[in-house]
Amino acid sequence: MEVLEQMRMLLREKAILFGQYEQETLRLDAVDDIVDAVQARQALIDKINGLDRRIAAIGESSAYGARCFHIGKNQCDYAGLTEAEQAVFRVGQEVFAIMTRIRELEDGIPGKMAVIQEQLQEKIKKNNVNGKFTGYLKQMGQGSKGVLYDKRR
C-alpha cells in the first residue's frame, strides 16, 4: 500500500506542476510577461522531469511497483482496480487531461507570437518617434540646455 500511496502523491504533485505550467503557457500572450513565463515553464519542466524519474524508479522497484506505474499511466482496466488503485488511476487521468489542454494551448502559440511581434513592433515605432522628437530638440539647440532639460523648471 505504501508504494501505491507514494505513486498517488507523486502523480498528484505532477498534476499540480502541470497546472502551473498551463498557467505559465496562458501568460505567453502578454508581451511583458513572455520572458518570465518561458523561464517559469522551463523550471516547471525540470521539476516534472524529476518526478518522472521518481515515478519510473517506483515502476522498476518491484512487480507491484510496475503495476502501480501502469495504473498511473491509465494502462489498465479501471473496473478491476481496488479503491486505492482507482484513486491513483484518477490522478493519472487528471495529469493527462492537463497535458491535453497544454497541447491545445501550445498549438495556438505561433498565432500568439505573431500578435506579440506586432505589439513589439508598434512599441518600437512609438519609441522611435520619441527619439526623433528628442533629436529634433537637440538639433534646434534645445535638447540639452533648453526647454526639455531646464533645471530651473
Predicted regions mapped to residue ranges:
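Carboxylate-rich helix-loop segments that flank metal/cofactor sites and access channels
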Residues: 56, 60-87
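Heptad-repeat coiled-coil alpha-helices
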Residues: 16, 20-23, 27-30, 50, ...
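Intrinsic-disorder/low-complexity regions
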Residues: 51, 73-76, 149
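Heptad-repeat register of long alpha-helical coiled-coils used for dimerization/oligomerization
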Residues: 4, 31, 38, 45, ...
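Proteins with a high burden of low-complexity, intrinsically disordered sequence enriched in S/T/G/P/A and R
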Residues: 1-2, 15, 63-68, 73, ...
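Amphipathic alpha-helical coiled-coil segments
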Residues: 43-59, 90, 95-105
